[in-house]
């Protein structure tokens, strides 16, 4: 059988993967701090006794676009935005430490601070705040709680956000959307990052997603047309093989 059917099939498979990545990016176009996922492909020439006229395609090392998103001023005390290489530490489902740029902090029914359901990690572990307290976050990540009835100038720190610094090449996104240290980074910096006291946050501000929704929609349309073309190639190769078999049977 002509190798073209295999090359077209491989290309169609990778096109579906590209569509899945683009769909995920579109779904997170309004997620604070989201970093668009990249999908890179590379050509792999087919080696063998036949002429080198066919080339397969395979996925290359995936990654994320670390371009900062635009800043949205929300005036909400629990919304924070970080510097370019700054990350918030959170606790993942398996108890390990992960990192996110999403600064939309919520308070769960038990008083624990969370981001997308993940407990926010402070310098002394997960952070909890008193029920009904007015929460403020300072530029250095210190969280203070003002209980009802307390004087307005009362400062009662309840914890401090663990702010860490890492470049895009040092972290990898997990299936839950939380970034973790790559194996290479763990070998040089340890299993978790240490808090960086030089980092600062802006309270009442959220960094938006860096997904370009218009470009992502264009990519979806282009991927759909590319997939359709690849299916036509497979169909044409199959038809040609059928006609060749008919000619051989006639002879």
UniProtKB/Swiss-Prot annotation:
Q: Give the originating organism.
A: Escherichia coli (strain K12)
GO BP terms: namely: bacterial-type flagellum-dependent cell motility; bacterial-type flagellum-dependent swarming motility; chemotaxis
Q: Per UniProt, which keywords does this protein have?
A: Bacterial flagellum
Q: Which PROSITE patterns match?
A: FLAGELLA_BB_ROD
Where does it live in the cell? Bacterial flagellum basal body
Q: Which PANTHER family does UniProt cross-reference here?
A: FLAGELLAR BASAL-BODY ROD PROTEIN FLGF, FLAGELLAR PROTEIN
Oligomeric and partner information: The basal body constitutes a major portion of the flagellar organelle and consists of five rings (E,L,P,S, and M) mounted on a central rod. The rod consists of about 26 subunits of FlgG in the distal portion, and FlgB, FlgC and FlgF are thought to build up the proximal portion of the rod with about 6 subunits each.
This protein is called: Flagellar basal-body rod protein FlgF
One Gene Ontology cellular component term attached to this UniProt record is: bacterial-type flagellum basal body, rod
What family name appears in the similarity comment? Belongs to the flagella basal body rod proteins family.
Does the record carry Transcription as a key word?
Answer: no
């Amino acid at each position: 059988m002509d190798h073209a059917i295999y090359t077209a099939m491989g290309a169609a498979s990778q096109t579906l993967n590209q569509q899945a990545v683009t769909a995920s990016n579109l779904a997170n176009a309004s997620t604070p701090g989201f970093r668009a996922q990249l999908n890179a492909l590379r050509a792999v020439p087919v080696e063998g006794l036949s002429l080198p006229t066919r080339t397969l395609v395979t996925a290359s090392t995936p990654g994320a676009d670390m371009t900062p998103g635009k800043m949205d001023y929300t005036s909400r005390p629990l919304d924070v935005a970080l510097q370019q290489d700054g990350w918030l530490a959170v606790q993942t489902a398996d108890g390990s430490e992960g990192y996110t740029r999403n600064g939309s902090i919520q308070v769960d029914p038990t008083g624990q601070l969370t981001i997308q359901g993940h407990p926010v990690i402070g310098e002394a572990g997960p952070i909890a705040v008193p029920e009904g307290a007015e929460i403020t976050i300072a530029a250095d990540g210190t969280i203070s709680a003002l209980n009802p009835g307390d004087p307005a100038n009362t400062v009662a720190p309840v914890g401090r956000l663990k702010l860490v610094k890492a470049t895009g090449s040092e972290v990898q996104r997990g299936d839950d959307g939380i970034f973790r240290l790559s194996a290479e980074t763990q070998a040089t910096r340890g299993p978790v990052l240490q808090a960086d006291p030089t980092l600062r946050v802006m309270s009442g501000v959220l960094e938006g997603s860096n997904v370009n929704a218009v470009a992502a929609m264009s990519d979806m349309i282009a991927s759909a047309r590319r997939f359709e073309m690849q299916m036509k190639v497979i169909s044409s190769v199959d038809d040609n093989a059928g006609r060749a078999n008919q000619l051989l049977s006639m002879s």
